[in-house]
Amino acid sequence: MKIFGTDGVRGKAGVKLTPMFVMRLGIAAGLYFKKHSQTNKILIGKDTRKSGYMVENALVSALTSIGYNVIQIGPMPTPAIAFLTEDMRCDAGIMISASHNPFEDNGIKFFNSYGYKLKEEEEKAIEEIFHDEGLLHSSYKVGESVGSAKRIDDVIGRYIVHLKHSFPKHLNLQSLRIVLDTANGAAYKVAPVVFSELGADVLVINDEPNGCNINEQCGALHPNQLSQEVKKYRADLGFAFDGDADRLVVVDNLGNIVHGDKLLGVLGVYQKSKNALSSQAIVATNMSNLALKEYLKSQDLELKHCAIGDKFVSECMRLNKANFGGEQSGHIIFSDYAKTGDGLVCALQVSALVLESKQVSSVALNPFELYPQNLVNLNVQKKPPLESLKGYSALLKELDQLEIRHLIRYSGTENKLRILLEAKDEKLLESKMQELKEFFEGHLC
Protein backbone atom coordinates (compact mmCIF):
# COMPACT_ATOMS: atom_id res chain seq x y z
CA MET A 1 0.00 0.00 0.00
CA LYS A 2 1.33 3.41 -1.00
CA ILE A 3 1.44 5.81 1.96
CA PHE A 4 3.19 8.89 0.60
CA GLY A 5 1.62 11.38 -1.81
CA THR A 6 3.23 14.24 -3.69
CA ASP A 7 4.01 16.11 -0.46
CA GLY A 8 4.47 13.65 2.38
CA VAL A 9 1.57 11.84 4.02
CA ARG A 10 -1.79 13.56 4.18
CA GLY A 11 -5.36 12.68 5.15
CA LYS A 12 -8.26 13.35 7.47
CA ALA A 13 -7.16 13.31 11.11
CA GLY A 14 -8.85 10.46 12.96
CA VAL A 15 -9.74 8.68 9.71
CA LYS A 16 -6.50 8.05 7.80
CA LEU A 17 -4.24 9.75 10.33
CA THR A 18 -5.23 7.75 13.40
CA PRO A 19 -2.91 7.57 16.44
CA MET A 20 -2.02 3.95 15.58
CA PHE A 21 -1.24 4.79 11.95
CA VAL A 22 0.90 7.78 12.96
CA MET A 23 2.81 5.75 15.57
CA ARG A 24 3.50 3.01 13.05
CA LEU A 25 4.68 5.56 10.48
CA GLY A 26 6.81 7.29 13.12
CA ILE A 27 8.54 4.03 14.05
CA ALA A 28 9.12 3.16 10.37
CA ALA A 29 10.58 6.59 9.61
CA GLY A 30 12.68 6.54 12.77
CA LEU A 31 14.16 3.14 11.89
CA TYR A 32 15.01 4.44 8.43
CA PHE A 33 16.76 7.54 9.81
CA LYS A 34 18.60 5.39 12.39
CA LYS A 35 20.54 3.77 9.55
CA HIS A 36 22.44 7.03 9.00
CA SER A 37 22.10 8.55 12.46
CA GLN A 38 24.70 11.08 13.57
CA THR A 39 23.12 12.78 16.58
CA ASN A 40 20.11 10.60 17.54
CA LYS A 41 17.89 13.72 17.50
CA ILE A 42 14.72 14.40 15.53
CA LEU A 43 13.00 17.80 15.37
CA ILE A 44 9.19 18.10 15.26
CA GLY A 45 7.18 21.21 14.39
CA LYS A 46 3.56 21.74 13.40
CA ASP A 47 1.04 24.26 12.15
CA THR A 48 -1.96 25.43 14.19
CA ARG A 49 -4.47 22.61 13.57
CA LYS A 50 -6.17 21.17 16.63
CA SER A 51 -5.29 17.64 15.52
CA GLY A 52 -1.61 18.59 15.59
CA TYR A 53 -1.51 17.72 19.29
CA MET A 54 -2.68 14.17 18.62
CA VAL A 55 -0.31 13.62 15.70
CA GLU A 56 2.64 15.16 17.54
CA ASN A 57 2.18 13.03 20.65
CA ALA A 58 1.82 9.87 18.57
CA LEU A 59 5.08 10.67 16.75
CA VAL A 60 6.90 11.47 20.00
CA SER A 61 5.72 8.17 21.50
CA ALA A 62 6.83 6.26 18.41
CA LEU A 63 10.26 7.85 18.11
CA THR A 64 11.17 7.68 21.80
CA SER A 65 10.06 4.03 21.87
CA ILE A 66 12.88 3.16 19.45
CA GLY A 67 15.45 5.28 21.26
CA TYR A 68 15.28 8.65 19.51
CA ASN A 69 15.51 11.92 21.41
CA VAL A 70 12.88 14.35 20.20
CA ILE A 71 12.89 18.15 20.14
CA GLN A 72 9.43 19.74 19.96
CA ILE A 73 9.27 23.37 18.84
CA GLY A 74 5.54 24.00 18.44
CA PRO A 75 3.87 26.00 15.64
CA MET A 76 6.44 27.01 13.02
CA PRO A 77 6.44 27.32 9.20
CA THR A 78 7.47 24.28 7.18
CA PRO A 79 10.61 26.03 5.84
CA ALA A 80 11.61 26.78 9.44
CA ILE A 81 11.64 23.04 10.14
CA ALA A 82 13.85 22.47 7.09
CA PHE A 83 16.25 25.20 8.23
CA LEU A 84 16.31 24.24 11.92
CA THR A 85 16.79 20.53 11.23
CA GLU A 86 20.17 21.29 9.66
CA ASP A 87 20.97 24.22 11.95
CA MET A 88 20.37 22.16 15.12
CA ARG A 89 22.25 19.12 13.73
CA CYS A 90 19.29 16.74 13.82
CA ASP A 91 19.10 13.43 11.97
CA ALA A 92 15.73 14.45 10.55
CA GLY A 93 12.93 16.97 10.80
CA ILE A 94 9.18 16.37 10.80
CA MET A 95 6.51 18.93 9.98
CA ILE A 96 2.92 18.19 10.97
CA SER A 97 0.72 20.05 8.49
CA ALA A 98 -1.76 19.62 5.67
CA SER A 99 -0.61 22.91 4.15
CA HIS A 100 -3.56 24.63 2.42
CA ASN A 101 -6.10 21.88 3.21
CA PRO A 102 -9.04 22.42 5.61
CA PHE A 103 -8.40 22.07 9.35
CA GLU A 104 -9.97 18.58 9.47
CA ASP A 105 -7.03 17.26 7.43
CA ASN A 106 -3.48 16.90 8.63
CA GLY A 107 -0.23 15.59 7.26
CA ILE A 108 3.36 14.63 7.96
CA LYS A 109 6.38 15.85 5.97
CA PHE A 110 9.87 14.47 6.54
CA PHE A 111 13.19 16.25 6.00
CA ASN A 112 16.66 14.71 5.97
CA SER A 113 19.54 16.03 8.06
CA TYR A 114 20.37 18.63 5.38
CA GLY A 115 16.83 20.04 5.39
CA TYR A 116 15.73 18.51 2.08
CA LYS A 117 12.44 16.70 1.55
CA LEU A 118 12.84 12.97 1.02
CA LYS A 119 13.29 11.50 -2.43
CA GLU A 120 10.75 8.97 -3.70
CA GLU A 121 13.12 6.06 -3.13
CA GLU A 122 13.55 7.15 0.50
CA GLU A 123 9.78 7.29 0.95
CA LYS A 124 9.49 3.80 -0.56
CA ALA A 125 12.10 2.52 1.92
CA ILE A 126 10.00 3.89 4.81
CA GLU A 127 6.88 2.27 3.32
CA GLU A 128 8.66 -1.10 3.22
CA ILE A 129 9.56 -0.81 6.91
CA PHE A 130 5.97 0.30 7.67
CA HIS A 131 4.69 -3.04 6.31
CA ASP A 132 7.35 -5.19 8.07
CA GLU A 133 5.54 -6.38 11.20
CA GLY A 134 8.49 -8.32 12.57
CA LEU A 135 10.92 -5.42 12.28
CA LEU A 136 8.50 -2.94 13.84
CA HIS A 137 7.73 -5.08 16.88
CA SER A 138 11.35 -6.05 17.50
CA SER A 139 12.62 -2.47 17.58
CA TYR A 140 11.33 -1.20 20.93
CA LYS A 141 13.95 -0.07 23.46
CA VAL A 142 13.86 -0.71 27.20
CA GLY A 143 15.39 0.90 30.26
CA GLU A 144 17.96 3.61 29.65
CA SER A 145 17.78 3.04 25.88
CA VAL A 146 14.32 4.63 25.63
CA GLY A 147 14.50 8.10 24.12
CA SER A 148 13.49 11.40 25.71
CA ALA A 149 11.51 14.43 24.53
CA LYS A 150 11.88 18.09 25.34
CA ARG A 151 10.09 21.23 24.21
CA ILE A 152 12.09 24.31 23.15
CA ASP A 153 10.03 27.47 22.67
CA ASP A 154 12.69 30.03 21.76
CA VAL A 155 14.02 28.65 18.45
CA ILE A 156 11.79 31.10 16.60
CA GLY A 157 14.58 33.65 17.15
CA ARG A 158 17.03 31.56 15.09
CA TYR A 159 14.61 31.48 12.18
CA ILE A 160 13.89 35.22 12.40
CA VAL A 161 17.62 36.01 12.25
CA HIS A 162 17.97 33.65 9.29
CA LEU A 163 15.11 35.38 7.45
CA LYS A 164 16.54 38.84 8.06
CA HIS A 165 19.90 37.68 6.69
CA SER A 166 18.14 36.84 3.40
CA PHE A 167 17.13 40.49 2.96
CA PRO A 168 19.68 42.85 1.33
CA LYS A 169 21.70 44.59 4.05
CA HIS A 170 21.68 47.96 2.27
CA LEU A 171 17.86 48.10 2.31
CA ASN A 172 15.12 48.51 4.91
CA LEU A 173 11.33 48.47 4.70
CA GLN A 174 10.66 51.85 6.31
CA SER A 175 9.09 53.27 3.16
CA LEU A 176 6.67 50.36 2.66
CA ARG A 177 3.20 49.79 4.07
CA ILE A 178 2.49 46.05 4.00
CA VAL A 179 -0.54 43.89 4.83
CA LEU A 180 0.14 40.31 5.99
CA ASP A 181 -2.46 37.53 5.92
CA THR A 182 -1.05 34.67 8.00
CA ALA A 183 -4.04 32.35 7.35
CA ASN A 184 -4.42 31.68 11.10
CA GLY A 185 -1.53 29.34 10.46
CA ALA A 186 2.11 28.67 11.19
CA ALA A 187 3.37 32.15 10.24
CA TYR A 188 1.12 34.04 12.67
CA LYS A 189 3.98 34.78 15.10
CA VAL A 190 7.05 35.03 12.92
CA ALA A 191 5.81 37.04 9.91
CA PRO A 192 4.78 40.24 11.78
CA VAL A 193 8.03 40.25 13.76
CA VAL A 194 10.27 39.97 10.69
CA PHE A 195 8.57 42.72 8.72
CA SER A 196 8.26 45.03 11.73
CA GLU A 197 11.93 44.60 12.70
CA LEU A 198 12.94 45.49 9.14
CA GLY A 199 10.99 48.74 9.47
CA ALA A 200 7.76 48.16 7.56
CA ASP A 201 4.43 49.71 8.52
CA VAL A 202 2.57 46.42 9.05
CA LEU A 203 -1.10 45.49 9.24
CA VAL A 204 -1.74 41.83 10.10
CA ILE A 205 -4.98 39.96 9.41
CA ASN A 206 -6.03 36.38 10.21
CA ASP A 207 -3.44 35.95 12.96
CA GLU A 208 -5.67 34.47 15.69
CA PRO A 209 -5.58 30.68 15.28
CA ASN A 210 -8.03 28.63 17.35
CA GLY A 211 -7.17 25.20 15.97
CA CYS A 212 -10.11 25.15 13.58
CA ASN A 213 -9.80 28.33 11.50
CA ILE A 214 -6.55 27.68 9.62
CA ASN A 215 -7.01 28.56 5.90
CA GLU A 216 -10.70 29.33 6.54
CA GLN A 217 -11.63 31.86 3.84
CA CYS A 218 -8.19 33.43 4.25
CA GLY A 219 -4.55 33.06 3.31
CA ALA A 220 -3.04 32.06 -0.01
CA LEU A 221 -6.11 30.17 -1.26
CA HIS A 222 -8.52 33.01 -0.46
CA PRO A 223 -6.67 36.31 -1.07
CA ASN A 224 -9.76 38.46 -1.70
CA GLN A 225 -9.85 39.77 1.88
CA LEU A 226 -6.17 40.69 1.60
CA SER A 227 -6.88 42.50 -1.66
CA GLN A 228 -9.61 44.57 0.01
CA GLU A 229 -7.39 45.40 3.00
CA VAL A 230 -4.52 46.51 0.74
CA LYS A 231 -6.83 48.96 -1.02
CA LYS A 232 -8.46 50.11 2.22
CA TYR A 233 -5.10 50.58 3.98
CA ARG A 234 -3.51 52.09 0.84
CA ALA A 235 -0.69 49.63 1.23
CA ASP A 236 2.23 49.11 -1.13
CA LEU A 237 2.07 45.32 -0.98
CA GLY A 238 0.05 42.47 0.48
CA PHE A 239 1.35 39.00 1.28
CA ALA A 240 -0.85 35.95 1.92
CA PHE A 241 0.66 32.73 3.27
CA ASP A 242 -0.90 29.30 3.40
CA GLY A 243 -1.30 27.24 6.56
CA ASP A 244 2.34 26.17 6.81
CA ALA A 245 3.81 29.28 5.12
CA ASP A 246 5.76 27.50 2.39
CA ARG A 247 3.61 29.25 -0.18
CA LEU A 248 3.05 32.93 -1.01
CA VAL A 249 0.43 34.92 -2.87
CA VAL A 250 1.25 38.58 -3.58
CA VAL A 251 -1.22 41.46 -3.95
CA ASP A 252 -0.02 44.70 -5.55
CA ASN A 253 -0.85 48.26 -4.50
CA LEU A 254 -4.01 48.28 -6.63
CA GLY A 255 -5.32 45.14 -4.96
CA ASN A 256 -4.53 42.90 -7.93
CA ILE A 257 -3.39 39.34 -7.25
CA VAL A 258 -0.01 38.86 -8.94
CA HIS A 259 0.13 35.70 -11.05
CA GLY A 260 2.71 33.18 -9.84
CA ASP A 261 4.41 32.94 -13.23
CA LYS A 262 4.86 36.71 -13.33
CA LEU A 263 6.46 36.48 -9.89
CA LEU A 264 8.83 33.77 -11.09
CA GLY A 265 9.78 35.82 -14.12
CA VAL A 266 10.38 39.15 -12.44
CA LEU A 267 12.16 37.59 -9.44
CA GLY A 268 14.40 35.55 -11.73
CA VAL A 269 15.42 38.65 -13.68
CA TYR A 270 15.91 40.55 -10.41
CA GLN A 271 18.24 37.81 -9.14
CA LYS A 272 20.15 37.97 -12.42
CA SER A 273 20.54 41.76 -12.08
CA LYS A 274 22.21 41.19 -8.70
CA ASN A 275 24.48 38.47 -10.14
CA ALA A 276 22.79 36.16 -7.65
CA LEU A 277 21.93 33.31 -10.03
CA SER A 278 24.21 30.28 -9.94
CA SER A 279 23.33 29.41 -13.55
CA GLN A 280 21.28 30.76 -16.46
CA ALA A 281 18.59 28.17 -15.69
CA ILE A 282 15.37 28.85 -13.79
CA VAL A 283 13.13 25.93 -12.85
CA ALA A 284 9.33 25.84 -13.07
CA THR A 285 6.74 23.08 -13.34
CA ASN A 286 4.87 21.85 -16.39
CA MET A 287 1.97 24.12 -15.37
CA SER A 288 3.93 27.28 -16.11
CA ASN A 289 2.60 29.65 -18.76
CA LEU A 290 4.36 29.68 -22.13
CA ALA A 291 4.73 33.45 -21.77
CA LEU A 292 7.10 32.88 -18.83
CA LYS A 293 9.46 30.86 -21.02
CA GLU A 294 9.37 33.52 -23.74
CA TYR A 295 10.00 36.34 -21.25
CA LEU A 296 12.95 34.57 -19.65
CA LYS A 297 14.40 33.80 -23.08
CA SER A 298 14.24 37.52 -23.91
CA GLN A 299 16.34 38.11 -20.78
CA ASP A 300 18.89 35.42 -21.79
CA LEU A 301 17.58 32.98 -19.20
CA GLU A 302 16.55 29.37 -19.81
CA LEU A 303 13.43 27.79 -18.32
CA LYS A 304 13.74 24.17 -17.18
CA HIS A 305 10.52 22.23 -16.62
CA CYS A 306 9.84 19.59 -13.98
CA ALA A 307 6.95 17.63 -12.45
CA ILE A 308 4.49 19.37 -10.14
CA GLY A 309 5.50 19.59 -6.49
CA ASP A 310 8.14 21.71 -4.79
CA LYS A 311 10.30 18.68 -4.00
CA PHE A 312 10.54 18.04 -7.77
CA VAL A 313 11.39 21.71 -8.30
CA SER A 314 14.14 21.40 -5.69
CA GLU A 315 15.53 18.22 -7.28
CA CYS A 316 15.49 19.75 -10.77
CA MET A 317 17.28 22.82 -9.43
CA ARG A 318 20.03 20.64 -8.01
CA LEU A 319 20.38 18.70 -11.27
CA ASN A 320 20.68 21.95 -13.25
CA LYS A 321 22.87 23.71 -10.66
CA ALA A 322 20.16 26.37 -10.36
CA ASN A 323 19.42 28.30 -7.17
CA PHE A 324 16.02 29.73 -8.10
CA GLY A 325 12.76 28.11 -9.17
CA GLY A 326 9.19 27.49 -8.18
CA GLU A 327 5.57 26.81 -8.98
CA GLN A 328 2.93 29.25 -10.17
CA SER A 329 0.92 28.29 -7.06
CA GLY A 330 3.40 30.30 -4.98
CA HIS A 331 5.90 27.67 -3.83
CA ILE A 332 9.09 29.56 -4.73
CA ILE A 333 12.56 28.36 -3.76
CA PHE A 334 15.60 30.55 -3.21
CA SER A 335 18.01 27.73 -2.44
CA ASP A 336 20.72 30.07 -1.15
CA TYR A 337 18.39 30.71 1.79
CA ALA A 338 15.95 27.79 1.90
CA LYS A 339 15.90 24.11 0.93
CA THR A 340 12.15 24.22 0.25
CA GLY A 341 9.56 26.82 -0.68
CA ASP A 342 9.61 29.63 1.90
CA GLY A 343 6.81 32.19 1.74
CA LEU A 344 8.63 34.59 4.05
CA VAL A 345 11.94 34.52 2.16
CA CYS A 346 10.00 35.10 -1.06
CA ALA A 347 7.99 37.98 0.45
CA LEU A 348 11.21 39.68 1.54
CA GLN A 349 12.72 39.28 -1.94
CA VAL A 350 9.58 40.73 -3.53
CA SER A 351 9.79 43.68 -1.13
CA ALA A 352 13.45 44.24 -2.04
CA LEU A 353 12.63 44.07 -5.75
CA VAL A 354 9.89 46.70 -5.43
CA LEU A 355 12.16 48.98 -3.39
CA GLU A 356 15.04 48.75 -5.84
CA SER A 357 12.80 49.16 -8.89
CA LYS A 358 11.64 52.56 -7.56
CA GLN A 359 8.24 51.73 -9.08
CA VAL A 360 4.86 50.97 -7.53
CA SER A 361 4.32 47.23 -7.17
CA SER A 362 1.55 47.14 -9.81
CA VAL A 363 4.19 48.18 -12.37
CA ALA A 364 7.25 46.41 -10.95
CA LEU A 365 5.49 43.03 -10.71
CA ASN A 366 3.82 43.10 -14.13
CA PRO A 367 6.68 42.39 -16.56
CA PHE A 368 4.78 40.55 -19.33
CA GLU A 369 1.33 39.44 -20.47
CA LEU A 370 0.26 35.84 -19.98
CA TYR A 371 -1.37 33.57 -22.52
CA PRO A 372 -4.94 32.69 -21.49
CA GLN A 373 -5.02 29.70 -19.15
CA ASN A 374 -7.97 27.90 -17.59
CA LEU A 375 -7.44 25.75 -14.51
CA VAL A 376 -10.26 23.65 -13.05
CA ASN A 377 -10.08 21.42 -9.97
CA LEU A 378 -12.75 18.75 -10.34
CA ASN A 379 -13.88 16.71 -7.31
CA VAL A 380 -13.74 13.00 -8.19
CA GLN A 381 -14.96 9.83 -6.51
CA LYS A 382 -12.37 7.51 -8.06
CA LYS A 383 -8.95 7.72 -9.71
CA PRO A 384 -8.57 5.14 -12.49
CA PRO A 385 -5.67 5.64 -14.93
CA LEU A 386 -6.74 8.44 -17.27
CA GLU A 387 -5.51 6.46 -20.29
CA SER A 388 -8.09 3.76 -19.47
CA LEU A 389 -11.04 6.15 -19.98
CA LYS A 390 -12.83 5.54 -23.27
CA GLY A 391 -12.47 8.58 -25.52
CA TYR A 392 -9.63 10.16 -23.52
CA SER A 393 -6.96 9.67 -26.21
CA ALA A 394 -9.22 11.17 -28.87
CA LEU A 395 -9.82 14.22 -26.66
CA LEU A 396 -6.08 14.82 -26.27
CA LYS A 397 -5.52 14.40 -30.00
CA GLU A 398 -8.17 17.06 -30.71
CA LEU A 399 -6.57 19.46 -28.21
CA ASP A 400 -3.19 18.97 -29.89
CA GLN A 401 -4.70 19.64 -33.33
CA LEU A 402 -6.23 22.88 -32.01
CA GLU A 403 -2.85 23.88 -30.50
CA ILE A 404 -4.30 23.89 -27.01
CA ARG A 405 -1.63 23.11 -24.44
CA HIS A 406 -2.95 20.72 -21.80
CA LEU A 407 -1.96 19.22 -18.47
CA ILE A 408 -4.42 16.82 -16.85
CA ARG A 409 -3.53 14.97 -13.66
CA TYR A 410 -4.91 13.74 -10.36
CA SER A 411 -4.01 15.68 -7.23
CA GLY A 412 -1.51 13.82 -5.09
CA THR A 413 -3.06 15.12 -1.87
CA GLU A 414 -6.82 15.41 -2.53
CA ASN A 415 -9.60 13.57 -4.40
CA LYS A 416 -9.43 16.00 -7.29
CA LEU A 417 -8.59 16.03 -10.97
CA ARG A 418 -6.66 19.10 -12.07
CA ILE A 419 -7.28 20.26 -15.65
CA LEU A 420 -5.09 23.00 -17.12
CA LEU A 421 -5.60 24.34 -20.63
CA GLU A 422 -3.65 27.12 -22.36
CA ALA A 423 -4.25 28.73 -25.76
CA LYS A 424 -4.21 32.09 -27.51
CA ASP A 425 -7.99 31.99 -28.16
CA GLU A 426 -9.83 32.50 -24.86
CA LYS A 427 -13.30 31.58 -26.20
CA LEU A 428 -11.98 28.32 -27.64
CA LEU A 429 -10.33 27.65 -24.29
CA GLU A 430 -13.60 28.05 -22.38
CA SER A 431 -15.50 25.88 -24.85
CA LYS A 432 -13.01 23.01 -24.67
CA MET A 433 -12.79 23.24 -20.88
CA GLN A 434 -16.55 22.77 -20.65
CA GLU A 435 -16.28 19.70 -22.91
CA LEU A 436 -13.52 18.25 -20.73
CA LYS A 437 -15.46 18.90 -17.51
CA GLU A 438 -18.52 17.09 -18.89
CA PHE A 439 -16.35 14.19 -20.07
CA PHE A 440 -14.61 13.68 -16.72
CA GLU A 441 -17.79 14.25 -14.68
CA GLY A 442 -19.35 11.41 -16.65
CA HIS A 443 -16.44 9.05 -15.96
CA LEU A 444 -15.12 10.00 -12.52
CA CYS A 445 -17.88 11.68 -10.50
Curated annotation (Swiss-Prot):
<dbReference type="GO" id="GO:0009252">
    <property type="term" value="P:peptidoglycan biosynthetic process"/>
</dbReference>
<feature type="binding site">
    <location>
        <position position="244"/>
    </location>
    <ligand>
        <name>Mg(2+)</name>
    </ligand>
</feature>
<keyword id="KW-0460">Magnesium</keyword>
<comment type="similarity">
    <text>Belongs to the phosphohexose mutase family.</text>
</comment>
<dbReference type="GO" id="GO:0005829">
    <property type="term" value="C:cytosol"/>
</dbReference>
<keyword id="KW-0479">Metal-binding</keyword>
<dbReference type="Pfam" id="PF02879">
    <property type="entry name" value="PGM_PMM_II"/>
</dbReference>
<dbReference type="InterPro" id="IPR050060">
    <property type="entry name" value="Phosphoglucosamine_mutase"/>
</dbReference>
<dbReference type="InterPro" id="IPR006352">
    <property type="entry name" value="GlmM_bact"/>
</dbReference>
<dbReference type="Pfam" id="PF02878">
    <property type="entry name" value="PGM_PMM_I"/>
</dbReference>
<dbReference type="GO" id="GO:0006048">
    <property type="term" value="P:UDP-N-acetylglucosamine biosynthetic process"/>
</dbReference>
<feature type="modified residue" description="Phosphoserine">
    <location>
        <position position="99"/>
    </location>
</feature>
<dbReference type="GO" id="GO:0004615">
    <property type="term" value="F:phosphomannomutase activity"/>
</dbReference>
<comment type="function">
    <text>Catalyzes the conversion of glucosamine-6-phosphate to glucosamine-1-phosphate.</text>
</comment>
<dbReference type="GO" id="GO:0005975">
    <property type="term" value="P:carbohydrate metabolic process"/>
</dbReference>
<dbReference type="GO" id="GO:0008966">
    <property type="term" value="F:phosphoglucosamine mutase activity"/>
</dbReference>
<dbReference type="InterPro" id="IPR005844">
    <property type="entry name" value="A-D-PHexomutase_a/b/a-I"/>
</dbReference>
<protein>
    <recommendedName>
        <fullName>Phosphoglucosamine mutase</fullName>
        <ecNumber>5.4.2.10</ecNumber>
    </recommendedName>
</protein>
<dbReference type="InterPro" id="IPR005846">
    <property type="entry name" value="A-D-PHexomutase_a/b/a-III"/>
</dbReference>
<feature type="active site" description="Phosphoserine intermediate">
    <location>
        <position position="99"/>
    </location>
</feature>
<dbReference type="InterPro" id="IPR036900">
    <property type="entry name" value="A-D-PHexomutase_C_sf"/>
</dbReference>
<feature type="binding site" description="via phosphate group">
    <location>
        <position position="99"/>
    </location>
    <ligand>
        <name>Mg(2+)</name>
    </ligand>
</feature>
<keyword id="KW-0597">Phosphoprotein</keyword>
<dbReference type="Pfam" id="PF00408">
    <property type="entry name" value="PGM_PMM_IV"/>
</dbReference>
<dbReference type="GO" id="GO:0000287">
    <property type="term" value="F:magnesium ion binding"/>
</dbReference>
<dbReference type="InterPro" id="IPR005841">
    <property type="entry name" value="Alpha-D-phosphohexomutase_SF"/>
</dbReference>
<dbReference type="Pfam" id="PF02880">
    <property type="entry name" value="PGM_PMM_III"/>
</dbReference>
<dbReference type="InterPro" id="IPR016055">
    <property type="entry name" value="A-D-PHexomutase_a/b/a-I/II/III"/>
</dbReference>
<dbReference type="InterPro" id="IPR016066">
    <property type="entry name" value="A-D-PHexomutase_CS"/>
</dbReference>
<dbReference type="InterPro" id="IPR005845">
    <property type="entry name" value="A-D-PHexomutase_a/b/a-II"/>
</dbReference>
<feature type="binding site">
    <location>
        <position position="242"/>
    </location>
    <ligand>
        <name>Mg(2+)</name>
    </ligand>
</feature>
<keyword id="KW-0413">Isomerase</keyword>
<dbReference type="InterPro" id="IPR005843">
    <property type="entry name" value="A-D-PHexomutase_C"/>
</dbReference>
<feature type="binding site">
    <location>
        <position position="246"/>
    </location>
    <ligand>
        <name>Mg(2+)</name>
    </ligand>
</feature>
